[in-house]
Regions:
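S-adenosyl-L-methionine
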Residues: 1-30, 40-47, 69-95
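Class I SAM-dependent methyltransferase "Motif I" SAM/SAH-binding loop
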Residues: 35-38
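Conserved SAM/SAH-binding beta-strand->alpha-helix loop
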Residues: 60
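A short glycine-rich, Lys/Arg-flanked "PGG" loop and its adjoining helix->strand segment in the class I
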Residues: 120-134
């Protein structure tokens, strides 16, 4: 059945359990979604791609409970849940394990004095680079103008990633395989246009 892990102070033990299950599953590829919210994309992706393993990470109890309930109701067997901050276990993963990492609508922390609370930071990007396969992609979405600039600034600081956009439509139009989440629909209703950024991991220059 579905794999999910409760908070555990022994992080090395918990990540060891996760890694053992990753090996046991023998998936075609592994995709990480950070901050899955209501789980719309996570659930749809897993149902459409049963040979792909999805690891969802979200620190909020309510979202975890709803998502785990849906996983069990639909008998989805290719989702694992880390119900906490991904930064607590990111260093435990082997290098080059994820084919894709999704970060949809992270908290923008718009005030300048709170900028260090934003998930996207130089050090965190280094961690993501290490666990992402070469030519793997990071997909980010945001509806906040400050966060749009911040994402581009942080990624431009790291020569290991290449922004894939060639035209404005590449970041204005949602990738075809993503579903509209409740948060995204609310943003559009309130006239906040979501922007979609895709960065590919390349060898550092």
């Amino acid at each position: 059945g579905a794999k999910y892990f409760i908070k555990n102070s022994h992080l090395s033990l918990t990540s060891k359990l996760i890694l053992e299950d990753l090996v046991e599953f023998k998936p075609k590829k592994i995709i990480l979604e950070i901050g899955f919210g209501s789980g719309e994309n996570l659930l749809k992706s897993a149902k459409m791609n049963p040979d792909v393993l999805y690891l969802g990470a979200d620190p909020f109890l309510n979202t975890n409970a709803k998502c785990i309930k849906a996983i069990l109701n639909y008998n989805i067997k290719n989702i694992m849940i880390w119900p906490d901050d991904i930064r607590k276990i990111i260093e435990f993963f082997p290098s080059n394990i994820f084919s894709e990492i999704k970060i949809l609508f992270p908290d923008p922390w718009p005030k300048f004095k709170h900028k260090n609370r934003r998930l996207i930071q130089d050090n965190f990007l280094i961690s993501l680079y290490n666990v992402l396969k070469t030519n793997g992609i990071i997909t980010l979405a945001t509806d906040h103008f400050i966060m749009k600039s911040w994402i581009l600034e942080i990624f431009q600081n790291n020569s290991g990633f290449q922004w894939t956009a060639e035209t404005a439509d590449d970041w204005r139009i949602k990738p075809i395989h993503y579903v509209a989440t409740k948060y995204e629909q609310k943003a559009i209703y309130e006239n906040r246009d979501p922007h979609w950024f895709i960065f590919k991991k390349i060898k550092k220059i």
